[in-house]
């Protein structure tokens, strides 16, 4: 079966024990590793967590494939590595970037990666690395990331993610997550593509606890979609690239690694439409903490402290009375990397545009720019809708170090601090 078919089917749910077969009877019944698997397939286990994790935390999937993954020659380190591999010295300064320019030369997803910031080497079971991707051609090779799971946030152009477990098609305002070690290929459906990636080195992403919100709200499990089995039975030479401790290594295969005919388990790629997010907000006064906008979280061993939170700022009604409605001025223990998929962000009147990004590190003061602040103080507080917008945030408890490439790109705004420079004191001790 070829993965180029446009008709894609999905399975609904988050964290489910899924199962799928592209040929009838390809899944063994009642056991995982029979002496002879159906259709002459090989059984292979992909573990996303340690064997002895609590059952509620365990992630693993059984694959029934044409050729075992173990059949490959030695990997060799590629001469061309990911841009931004070298991190710069930590900086407390606030940083903001214009959209990165799309490539002029033929560039696939891998060649178009730029690491923007990171807070941990890949040999640590925690932390996050943040990238932007820029591409103008589909991959003719396959890739897997041994360093972490990948959260993809498209900003421009639709992608088809052809994975070992099947295909996902994602567009701007949708996201996709690829498990650590899952082989995949990125195909471009619109000629050019740009977007953001969080590489999660820590615990796998999961839905946040809802607490007093109750049993419904935010991102609902049924809106997450996993693929169905689709396989390639190809004997053409193909390059397989892996990312290992931050470096790219490759080997040449004599077959397609996307040859899984059937599978079952819960360590799966998935997609989610951000437009399905059930936004929670105040119906009385004050601006709630932005944690109410959390889509996915990777926890740490400290309860309530995230390795990374993925947070969105979607279209929503603003109805708070006697309230400064934009996100307030803030100094945060957490480190915030923001991007904009479409529209405008309500705390920035200008300078933060779709495809751009910003980084506010631990305790770096930030908040609405002067123009947004003045408008909010003088606003008529009638209910109004913030529409046609989608900003997001990768928030992590560990300090992010920008890469040298991110600091040297012409897209870096050297005048970012100026957006707060015209804030003036309005204090008057004689007038309350």
Curated annotation (Swiss-Prot):
Hexamer; dimer of trimers. This is Homogentisate 1,2-dioxygenase. The gene is hmgA. Pathway: Amino-acid degradation; L-phenylalanine degradation; acetoacetate and fumarate from L-phenylalanine: step 4/6. PANTHER family: HOMOGENTISATE 1,2-DIOXYGENASE. Signal peptide: none annotated. Its cofactor is Fe cation. It comes from the Bacteria. Involved in the catabolism of homogentisate (2,5-dihydroxyphenylacetate or 2,5-OH-PhAc), a central intermediate in the degradation of phenylalanine and tyrosine. Catalyzes the oxidative ring cleavage of the aromatic ring of homogentisate to yield maleylacetoacetate. It comes from Pseudomonas paraeruginosa (strain DSM 24068 / PA7) (Pseudomonas aeruginosa (strain PA7)). It holds the Pfam family HgmA_N. GO terms for biological process: L-phenylalanine catabolic process; tyrosine catabolic process. InterPro entries: HgmA_C, HgmA_N, Homogentis_dOase, Homogentis_dOase_bac, RmlC-like_jellyroll, RmlC_Cupin_sf. GO terms for molecular function: homogentisate 1,2-dioxygenase activity; iron ion binding.
